[in-house]
């Protein structure tokens, strides 16, 4: 980033769980930012509409917006929304940035460890090949949608998020009610790997990637110690001081949630943040016990 220019970021999805944490860090560091809200004139990610006027005075873009992948069963219509809101929105931003007279220096986009698919015990790093399935295809299209910005010489960073842990939203918030009543348990056989990250570490990584010119390309945004679901279940029970003796059969998850349940709850993804650690990024919460203790 040009050190002579005061940074000012344009942020999509700024009111969401991750966006709110990112903007809080930016505020604490005195870094300016502007929100680009869905429905605002000149911005419709699902339709691929972006007016470059929003880039005036902007030095970088942090793109978080997209249809929630756990918002409902994956009907054909919902899958199209998940895909288009990410791919068309990212491409519109990248093309707008590439065409701007005063090009922003950096585009930071959210991505997902869903790229790796269901891999059992295999360890995945940024150099691993893609897996198979709907999420893999979404991520491949999503990341390549930023090519116009990359081709224009703009620094592009893709942060492949694992399960972002926060008591305020996302997966953990949905898990808490049954666990608090002592009705929690492992999913299926509990052997599937969960690649997770504390919300604060995820937000700090976005800010670091946005403000450090050395960050470029793909980074796995996960804690350095993934856990199997059975161990996560035990850690959550310990944090809440509740028993965890009610497993949820895999067949029930498939029956109730279909493909979404198989991909988000039963798939095993053991991902390591190899590039993030090589960059000397420091995790505040590298292990699941301390992360849950802080959150709960």
Regions from the PLM with identified roles:
Residues 3, 7, 263-296:
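C-terminal amphipathic/interface module of NAD(P)-dependent oxidoreductases
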Residues 8-28:
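N-terminal Rossmann NAD(P)H-binding glycine-rich loop of SDR-like oxidoreductase domains
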Residues 41-92:
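NAD(P)H-binding glycine-rich loop region in Rossmannoid oxidoreductase-like domains
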Residues 91-133:
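Conserved Rossmann-fold NAD(P)-dependent oxidoreductase catalytic core, especially the SDR/UDP-sugar
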Residues 111, 144-167:
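Conserved beta-loop-beta element that borders a ligand/cofactor-binding pocket
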Residues 140, 152-154, 165-174, 209-219:
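Glycine/proline-rich active-site loop of Rossmann-fold NAD(P)-dependent oxidoreductases
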Residues 212-259, 293:
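Mid/C-terminal beta-alpha module of Rossmann-like enzyme folds, strongest
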